[in-house]
Amino acid sequence: MYATVTVTVLLLISSGIFCQNEKLCSNGGTECNRHCGQNNTVGICHGQNGKLKCECVEYKRKMF
């Protein structure tokens, strides 16, 4: 019984995370960039058609 409840909770949490990522990446990634920009990072959408996951990465500019 506890295993069933645990699996159900994990599935609900993961589906909520994916829905949020799809929302952030649905309009070409501008919302993802805005979301990640709050932490001084750059948002990159990737996955199927570039709409599955919003990932925040640190951007380092090289000075020559």
UniProtKB/Swiss-Prot annotation:
Keywords of the record: Disulfide bond, Ion channel impairing toxin, Neurotoxin, Secreted, Signal, Toxin
GO molecular function: ion channel regulator activity; toxin activity
Tissue/organ expression: Expressed by the venom gland.
Range of residues in the leader sequence: 1-19
Localization, UniProt: Secreted
Keyword Secreted among UniProt keywords: yes
Record's keyword annotation contains Ligase: no
GO cellular component: extracellular region
Covalent S-S links between cysteines: C25-C45, C32-C54, C36-C56
Protein name (database record): Putative neurotoxin-H
Species this protein is from: Lychas mucronatus (Chinese swimming scorpion)
